[in-house]
Amino acid sequence: MRLKDLIDTLTEQAKERLLSSNREHQFTPEALDKTAHQIGLAALKFADLQHDPKQNYQFDIDKFMRFEGKTGPYLQYAAVRIQSLLEKANLDSSGKSAIQSPADLPESARDVCIHLTRFPEIIQESLAHKSPNILCEAAFQLAQSFSRFYNAAPILTESNQSVRILKINLCQQTF
């Protein structure tokens, strides 16, 4: 199969998934096509990069197009979720939190922090071994960690302003 044909197939499958998720009303026809193309490319790129470059793998379109699990569309979904949250927060990033100790953070937020602090080391390891799959794994783990954080406690409706600012700042760092 030629690359262009594969991209077209992935784009069409992404478009079908968007339409079947009852989200078509959120898109103009042009935006739907563009979003489907972006999802298809993310699926292709992440599917290839997540595997050890020294190993063979079978490209499974259905598996790599899922919006859950270790896929490009899942990572895109996590990023779009964070971006949407930040737009709704409309917070000046100079906001400061009164929380001083990691012990004051919810466990799910601490887990995100741990993943974020390890990222520079992971990037270096990925470069040193010429293995982008290391970075892909870390990005997936961060997305999972953020999802747990997002689902564990309110962010935008947090009543404690200091904690709310901290959570939004953590979202900014993750994005």
Model segments located where?
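Non-catalytic interaction-recognition regions
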Residues: 1-175
